[in-house]
Amino acid sequence: VTLQSGRPFTVGLLPAIDNSNTGRAALGFGSNDRPNQTGSPALSDASVERWFDTEAFVFPAFGSFGNTGRNTLEGPGFANVNLALLKGVALSDAARVQLRLEAFNLFNRTNLDLPDAFLGSPTFGQIRSARPARRLQLGLKLMF
């Protein structure tokens, strides 16, 4: 069983935007520049279409970095149950076989990924992906 609160994330400008005029729009993994936060991004009715209040963020004046802090928002939580059923049978004194049935995400709970956190993106504030659905695995293990 795994239970986790949501992962923190940072709102930034699209990686191609060099709003601070430093000559470095991105370091290869996201935006260097951040927007200005003008209000609370918290929503009482967050959904995959609008995880946070996108209107709480605006482009800063050209040549500035913006005032949004690092990891100021939290994504969806994560809950997962994995289960394995094993049955071992002795074939001889030196050999055994093990039948395995394994279930990952047993209850098939939808665990959402982080929302799009880049101001200027058409999907800003939306969650567009989720972690894998339930997977079942049947195996036979021979030990000698």
Annotated model-derived regions:
Residues 1-144:
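Short, solvent-exposed micro-motifs at the edges of structured domains
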